[in-house]
From Swiss-Prot:
It is an enzyme of class 2 (transferase). Its main location: cytoplasm. Coiled coil: none annotated. A zinc finger (C4-type) spans 30-51. One of its GO terms (cellular component) is acetyl-CoA carboxylase complex. Acetyl-CoA carboxylase is a heterohexamer composed of biotin carboxyl carrier protein (AccB), biotin carboxylase (AccC) and two subunits each of ACCase subunit alpha (AccA) and ACCase subunit beta (AccD). Zn(2+) binds at residues 30, 33, 49, 51. Pathway: Lipid metabolism; malonyl-CoA biosynthesis; malonyl-CoA from acetyl-CoA: step 1/1. The gene is accD1. Belongs to the AccD/PCCB family. This is Acetyl-coenzyme A carboxylase carboxyl transferase subunit beta 1.
Length: 298
């Protein structure tokens, strides 16, 4: 088993976003090592620096994991509602929604749909961190619950790719109840024997981590991803202690048994394909076992 994921990685190309603006600068500076990287080379390397630092991908770029032309989007018109007419000293929620929709071209922070990896069908949900921090509100939760139901009905695996600050505070209790709602939907997916594979990318916090991602059958994280419930600064201010430098990193969580693996972005499609192959014929294998003669008891 230890050699299961050591095959030559099959890379994926980040999907091109329509009408994407030409970058103003020809170079990108890595925030980790400070090196200047030629923009085209940086894009070809899936926005990963040679030092290993993984920069953020847009939600639609993550769809490059799927087979070309296989993605079909669901519920794109489903949009958040400002039920509380939320206003704070810093912003008006309705204005913030409009700005995020204009900036990202999305109605909300989650894209859902169906697709395939190496010909194996699945349902997928991808967060967009640039849309109010990838936060989960009412429309987000409804989209996610619907795609989980779709996966259960079609009896295919669910893949979620998650970068989020947690539940959307501007929607109050409506946002919090989505945590229970999507987890309830996941029980139906489990009942039909289909897996939920969660990929955690930097950052993944709050209600998103505390609900559907933590109960996934397989939890994968990118190297160096920050993952936790409360943020590092909040914890340090609360306990009045300095936390270790590697606290809440993907590697820290792996060493404490909280996630299953840490996978570099360039190897992710290959690892997902391997996992999907393991699950692909699971119902048939289960039926074979059920129909096999009972073992003689000692």
């Amino acid at each position: 088993m230890k050699d299961l994921f050591r095959r030559a990685p099959k890379r994926f190309t980040a999907a091109r976003i329509e009408n994407q603006a030409i970058p103003d600068n020809m170079w990108v500076k890595c925030p980790s090592c400070g090196d200047l990287i030629y923009t085209r080379q940086f894009s070809d390397n899936l926005k990963v620096c040679k030092c290993g630092y993984h920069m953020r991908l847009a939600a639609r770029e993550w769809l490059g994991l799927l087979d070309d032309g296989s993605f079909v989007e669901f519920d794109a018109a489903l949009a958040p509602v400002d039920a509380l007419e939320f206003i704070s000293p810093r912003h008006v929620y309705a204005h913030k929604l409009s700005e995020s929709q204009e900036q990202t071209g999305l109605n909300d922070a989650l894209i859902t749909g169906s697709g395939a990896i190496e010909g194996m069908p699945l349902c997928v949900a991808v967060t967009e961190f640039e849309f109010i921090g990838g936060s989960m509100g009412g429309a987000f939760g409804e989209r996610l619950a619907r795609i989980i139901e779709q996966a259960a009905d079609a009896r295919v695996p669910l893949l979620t790719i998650n970068a989020s600050g947690g539940a959307r505070q501007e929607e109050g209790t409506l946002a919090l109840l989505q945590m229970a709602k999507v987890n309830m939907a996941l029980t139906r997916l489990a009942a039909v024997g289909q897996p939920h594979i969660a990929v955690l990318v930097d950052p993944c916090y709050g209600g998103v981590l505390a609900s559907y991602t933590s109960v996934a059958d397989i939890i994968i994280a990118e190297p160096g991803a920050r993952i936790g419930f409360a943020g590092r600064r909040v914890i340090e201010q609360t306990i009045r202690q300095k936390l270790p430098a590697h606290f809440q990193t993907a590697e820290f969580l792996l060493s404490h048994g909280m996630i299953d693996m840490v996978t570099p972005r360039g190897e992710l499609r290959s690892v997902l394909a391997t996992l999907l192959r393991l699950f692909h014929n699971a119902p048939e294998r289960a039926a074979d076992v059920q129909n096999a003669p009972a073992l003689a008891r000692a």
